[in-house]
Curated annotation (Swiss-Prot):
Substrate binds at residues 99-101, 130-133, 140-142, 188, 320, 325-327. It is an enzyme of class 4 (lyase). Belongs to the class-II fumarase/aspartase family. Fumarase subfamily. Signal peptide: none annotated. One of its GO terms (molecular function) is fumarate hydratase activity. This is Fumarate hydratase class II. There are 2 substrate-binding sites: the catalytic A site, and the non-catalytic B site that may play a role in the transfer of substrate or product between the active site and the solvent. Alternatively, the B site may bind allosteric effectors.
Length: 467
């Protein structure tokens, strides 16, 4: 950026702007007055906003509101923003006006100045393209920003998170099938329990991910309705009839996703319940991933002094002081992401409750946290799947040793000798270091042959194919 400046003007007067920048007066004022934190408006929102400006230019042109030549320059400039050509022209923090007005104007100014340049004009002149009169024609920040929020979120879900979850689910299902015949001891309350198969255990993980994915896909359906056309308070003031429907249709054609104008524009401005719902679904996914990652790292603990039922792939040396140590780092990274997503959901829930009258003014905070949750979950789940889960293998020797030592196999005797006698068998075996069979026979509750007939692992597993 050069030190040369130019003067740009808004309703408050003149503002100095770096000469080589495409933003204008309102962006410059925001940079001056809202130098808060390091969090910038996500580029996903900027690109979604540029898609919206392109769709609006097309709709305004077709409705006779915008000159076709002006529309052409706006569309070309918007395409450049969508392509990421001007990503460095969007410097604003998320800590700004709660309606996202400053970001809306940042996009308007950049597109307008680039369109002016394409038309052969002078950057900053507002001629032949004006950021408000032409780029923002038929729009308000109050309907454009929430529209961009939905578009950005849908794209992030469809193109990042959902494909990652499908990959994760496939690997979990493959592991469940591969481990279907490996009998192990279950654990409840962190204590030994009755047996199940390792495949059954992994089928539970797969079911959790499938359910979380379904919750996200349900929430996704509520993000297709868009606020565009509502303008300032939901009445559509200054927007031509049919504008919102046309813009939504253009966005649907551009993206391939079924966007449509919201049935109730007032709720679309004043509340962000669909994003709150989605954030809750993301938290549910985080809870599932936390449980899965914790189980896998506990089952892989050791190698000699832990549970050691699973062998996890080594990604890197684990300690700067203990040679040969390898840690479950993919599980650790994933669980940290899950904690962050849960925190983000708390912020989104509070922000979503703060819609006063006709407008919620926590929009930048909501979209920042939702998009961060999607990005973190996408990246972490992909990393966990590719660098840990696919390489997980059973330690059959350790698993079998636990099965042979388990006292909870005594549960199979309950129907034959009763709970109290079965408990006495387990107590005697534990206190005297005997096998269950030895203890049961010595107590006179059954014969060795009866024990072998009744305590059979394959009869204690239920439906091994349960998923």
């Amino acid at each position: 950026m050069t030190t040369d400046t130019r003067l740009e003007y808004d309703s408050l007067g003149a503002v100095e702007v770096p000469a080589d920048c495409y933003w204008g007066a309102q962006t410059a004022r925001s940079l001056k007055h809202f130098a808060i934190g390091s969090q910038r408006m996500p580029l996903a929102v900027i690109h979604a906003m540029a898609r919206l400006k392109k769709a609006a230019a097309i709709a305004n042109r077709d409705l006779g509101v915008l000159d076709p030549e002006k529309a052409k320059w706006i569309i070309q400039a918007a395409d450049e923003v969508i392509a990421g050509q001007w990503d460095d022209q969007f410097p604003l923090a998320i800590w700004q006006t709660g309606s996202g007005t400053q970001t809306n104007m940042n996009v308007n100014e950049v597109i307008a100045n680039r369109a002016i340049e394409l038309a052969g004009g002078v950057k900053g002149s507002k001629s032949p393209i004006h950021p408000n009169d032409h780029v923002n024609c038929s729009q308000s920040s109050n309907d454009t920003f929430p529209t961009a929020m939905h578009v950005a979120t849908v794209l992030a879900l469809q193109e990042r998170l959902l494909p990652t979850l499908r990959h994760l689910l496939t690997v979990l299902q493959e592991k469940a099938a591969a481990f279907a015949e490996i009998i192990k001891i279950g654990r409840t309350h962190l204590m030994d329990a009755v047996p199940l198969t390792l495949g059954q255990e992994f089928s539970g993980y797969a079911s959790q991910i499938a359910a979380a994915q379904a919750h996200i896909e349900y929430a996704l359906q509520h993000l297709y309705p868009l606020a565009i056309g509502a303008t300032a308070v939901g009445t559509g003031l200054n927007a031509p009839a049919g504008f919102g429907d046309r813009v939504a249709a253009e966005l649907a054609q551009m993206t391939g996703y079924p966007f449509r104008k919201a049935e109730n524009p007032f709720a679309a401005l004043a509340a962000h319940d669909p994003l709150v719902m989605l954030s809750g679904a993301l938290k549910t996914l985080a809870a599932a991933l936390m449980k899965i990652a914790n189980d896998i790292r506990w089952l892989g603990s050791g190698p000699r002094c832990g549970l050691g039922e699973l062998r996890l792939p080594a990604n890197e040396p684990g300690s700067s002081i203990m040679p040969g140590k390898v840690n479950p780092t993919q599980c650790e990274a994933l669980t940290m992401v899950c904690v962050q997503v849960m925190g983000n959901d708390a912020a989104v829930g509070i922000a979503g409750s703060q819609g006063n009258f006709e407008l919620n003014v926590y929009k930048p905070l909501i979209i920042y946290n939702v998009l961060q949750s999607i990005a973190l979950l996408s990246d972490a789940a992909q990393s966990f799947t590719d660098h840990c889960l696919v390489g997980v293998e059973p330690n059959r020797q350790q698993i079998q040793a636990y099965v042979e030592r388990s006292l909870m196999l005594v549960t199979a005797l309950n129907p034959h000798i009763g709970y109290d006698k079965a408990a006495a068998v387990a107590k005697k075996a534990y206190s005297e270091g005997k096998t269950l069979k030895e203890a049961a026979v010595e107590l006179g509750y059954l014969t060795a042959e009866e024990f072998d007939r009744w305590v059979r692992l394959e009869l204690m597993l239920g439906e091994k194919g349960t998923s």
